[in-house]
Amino acid sequence: RGPQKLGFDFTMAFQPIIDLPQRRVFAREALVRGTDGSGAGSVLSQVTTANRYAFDQRCSVKAIEEAARLGVEDAVSINFMPNAIYEPSACIRTTLLAAARHNWPVERIIFEFTEAEQIDPTHLQRIFEEYRRIGFKVAIDDFGAGFSGLRWLADLKPDIVKLDLELIRHVDADPRRRAIV
């Protein structure tokens, strides 16, 4: 696939991801925002089946560009849409070029997906394997909120699992939630 016109612009905000035992920021999650300061919803509402691939590609490039411009020293975690990726080794080329252009080591890139849509587990496993082969880390975001189950943890072997907020809410006072976590 060649470059596609997206039809709208957006920027990134970087939210720290904390390693609690170490009590330090170890990465920054790149979150889409409107150029007018609006939230992710205003941007994501413009993503369609027709522009999903272009949006996914632009998110990766924009996250690296903005992190480099801002002097981010931690790893950058980039959300991706597995259903926008038709062939992992081909679809990652634009990201690799952006990383090289900005001297951003692939070891400082984490790709994470949210289980917001039905995903073919075999396809996702191929993506994870290719990304790991390149040197990226892979993560599941909002685990426990979507379509996947514990089997995905065993099969996908993510480097990082970010639990859904509703799963950990009141974990200190709820023995069942604590046991799950």
Feature locations, PLM:
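Conserved protein-kinase N-lobe ATP-binding Lys motif
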Residues: 36, 47-50, 80-85
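The catalytic core of metal-dependent phosphodiesterases that act on cyclic dinucleotides
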Residues: 99-170
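Alpha-helix-loop-beta-strand connector modules within alpha/beta enzyme cores
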Residues: 180-181
